[in-house]
């Protein structure tokens, strides 16, 4: 389903933990990393597509996450010319994305990259909040920057509400 401007409707998913870190996933058989994302099927809402992609790509269901926010607007990126499939009609020149910020409420053990017969990812890790903006492939960087900027206050408020470790001897440093 490509729109009149040549963009494919898509959802993007940022999953965070209580420490304000975000899940960063390695594309299957590649050295590139990104957030989970995927197309919206005909007749499917953005939220329905998000839950479907969440399960297909990282094995999580509704009970494992809580929706914290979604982007106000659709965000677009163009594909580099070398990635455009010119032989398909209509030609897709990029993606228009609705992004969701989710908090993982179950444990890390629930994450499973192998739920699909054709997995998108083969590994993942928690990274600092702004890390993906610097590391994602260049043609997605502007969208990632906008997404992370829009979601930042929500994620930072999670961190503020997370109990801090007690000041025990394990955390003390001798001053001299």
UniProtKB/Swiss-Prot annotation:
Which Pfam family is one of this chain's hits? NUDIX
Q: Which family does it belong to?
A: Belongs to the Nudix hydrolase family. RppH subfamily.
GO biological process terms, alphabetically, are: mRNA catabolic process
Domain Nudix hydrolase, residue spans: 6-149
A single GO CC term for this protein reads: cytoplasm
**MF GO annotations:** mRNA 5'-diphosphatase activity
Q: What is this protein called?
A: RNA pyrophosphohydrolase
Q: Which InterPro entries match?
A: Nudix_hydrolase, NUDIX_hydrolase-like_dom_sf, NUDIX_hydrolase_CS, NUDIX_hydrolase_dom, RppH
Described purpose of this protein according to its UniProt entry: Accelerates the degradation of transcripts by removing pyrophosphate from the 5'-end of triphosphorylated RNA, leading to a more labile monophosphorylated state that can stimulate subsequent ribonuclease cleavage.
* PROSITE patterns assigned to the protein according to its UniProt record, in alphabetical order: NUDIX, NUDIX_BOX
Transmembrane portions of the chain:
none
Q: Which organism is it from?
A: Shigella boydii serotype 18 (strain CDC 3083-94 / BS512)
What is the required cofactor set for this protein?
a divalent metal cation
Residue ranges for motif Nudix box?
38-59
* UniProt EC number: 3.6.1.-
- In the record, what lineage is assigned to the organism producing the protein? Bacteria, Pseudomonadati, Pseudomonadota, Gammaproteobacteria, Enterobacterales
Q: Which NCBIfam families match?
A: PRK00714.1-1, PRK00714.1-4, PRK00714.1-5
- Gene symbol here is rppH
Give start-end of the signal peptide: none
Instruction: Cite the entry's keywords alphabetically.
Output: Hydrolase
